[in-house]
Amino acid sequence: MSYIQKRGQNTAWRTALMRNLTTELIINESLEVTQTRAKELRRHFDHMITLAKRGDLHSRRQAASWLRDIDADKKETALQKLFNKLAKKYENRNGGYTSILKLDNRKGDNAPMVIIKLI
């Protein structure tokens, strides 16, 4: 996408960043990140919800290959939360699963900060 920039990092670093942020958004349902990261994260998260809404084995395996194997709580992992809770929550919605709320700029480097949260 045009709004994600390299910032001196390679593709593996950016992919790992998006995988971690996607997993954390599923677990916490809200994150405070920079505006550029939030816009890129929205694209990956929407794809995960689309896979969860499909619900077949192939979709589950695709999502498992992207998400980190982290416990969302004592009973379920992030993948289980995605397929069991979030897929049902968004089954009648065709997109736009997140909202981005602007905050003040970060104090150290004046980067535009936002909160990305699930609707």
From Swiss-Prot:
Its ancestry begins with: Bacteria, Bacillati, Mycoplasmatota, Mollicutes, Mycoplasmataceae
Coiled-coil intervals, chain numbering: none
Name used for this protein in its record: Large ribosomal subunit protein bL17
The record's Gene Ontology cellular component field reads: cytosolic large ribosomal subunit
Q: Where is the signal peptide?
A: none
GO BP term (any one): translation
Regarding protein family, the annotation reads:
Belongs to the bacterial ribosomal protein bL17 family.
Name the InterPro entries for this protein.
Ribosomal_bL17, Ribosomal_bL17_CS, Ribosomal_bL17_sf
Task: Give an example GO molecular function.
Answer: structural constituent of ribosome
Q: Quaternary arrangement and interactors, per the entry?
A: Part of the 50S ribosomal subunit. Contacts protein L32.
Q: Which UniProt keywords apply?
A: Ribonucleoprotein, Ribosomal protein
The family database entries (PROSITE patterns) matched by this protein are listed as: RIBOSOMAL_L17
Q: Tell me the domain of life.
A: Bacteria
